[in-house]
Amino acid sequence: MEPQLNQEVINTAALHDGPIETDAVIVGAGPVGLFQVFELGLLEIKAHIIDSLAYPGGQPIELYPDKPIYDIPAIPVCTGKELTDNLMKQIEPFGPTFHLGQEVSVLEKQEDGRFFVETSKGTKFLTKTIFIAAGVGAFQPKLLRVDGLDKFDNSQLFYRVKNPADFAGKNLIIVGGGDSALDWALNFVAEGPNKAESVILIHRRDGFKAAPANVAKMKELCDAYEMQFIIGQVTGYDEKEGRLTAAKVTGADGITRVVPLDVMLVFFGLSPKLGPIAHWGLDIERKQIKVDTEKFSTNIPGIFAVGDINTYPGKKKLILSGFHECALAAFGAAPFIFPDKKIHLQYTTTSPKLHKVLGVESPVFD
């Protein structure tokens, strides 16, 4: 479920003839990457954001868009989608430019101290600073390995649900044993506009890594013949006239059953990969970037790392910790962008300058 996007904010940059010259490039559009835009914006530093996903929000949007989050200060509870929507609204005044569905493939230090950055789609930048907010790396879905099945990708085989309405009235096979598989199985069985014609859940064993209440609900629905659960693994498929018509499911008994379908949804989880980041010359420890906690700078001057991607003594992988890191990283980066300017700490409650930057009126006190 993708976040609500303001087109002016989310407008992905058009192709440029030459590199885009900018003060800051943020790698990662999860909550911490989005809040980095805000902290930089308060210091009048404009940013471009790159993310491998086709939409902002990172892990909360990809893994738990509808799950409640309880540990964001002053927000008793919100979902991953609500958190993303609120962050997108918060950064609107700073007009960041998003470059989505692409990864950084090249990073080179230039003689003038700037960095040359190129993405997998050929977008090029010359930037004074880089903020790596890539979480645990670029997310790639874990694939169902059946020879030839990949030719049905994004037509009848899907690894995520963008629009539930696309699957309404269909005969669905859902493969997996985690929260996503159970959540979507229950979603498509439920009465409503997205109800499927039939739902068959396939998992290799009877145990699940999912919320016990959802597992119990699934078994209730099976007992009521409203859906089916088959223990086994997809080992093959049938097709007719270029269309996927059935999955071959082999059980622990060695018997292979042919299960008709319209669409197959696979939820094996997402595999985070550091990708090219691992080859940028950064000091990496157990797939995390080492930083100092004064500025959250890396061993390469001008490159900062915030959020789950970094490590330091006492590190806790919490969204609120990442927000704190963004503030210090922004102040740490300011001298690279404004070498002759003294940066003063100002407060959004009282600073007319920050009110102007934020596009709000300064309060008048009697």
From Swiss-Prot:
EC class (word): oxidoreductase
Keyword Membrane annotated: no
Sites where the protein binds FAD: D51, Q59, Y64, V104, F139, D308, T349
Cofactor annotation remark: Binds 1 FAD per subunit.
UniProt keywords, alphabetically: FAD, Flavoprotein, NADP, Oxidoreductase
Entry's Gene Ontology molecular function annotations: ferredoxin-NADP+ reductase activity; flavin adenine dinucleotide binding; NADP binding
HAMAP family in alphabetical order: FENR2
Family: Belongs to the ferredoxin--NADP reductase type 2 family.
Protein name stated in the entry: Ferredoxin--NADP reductase
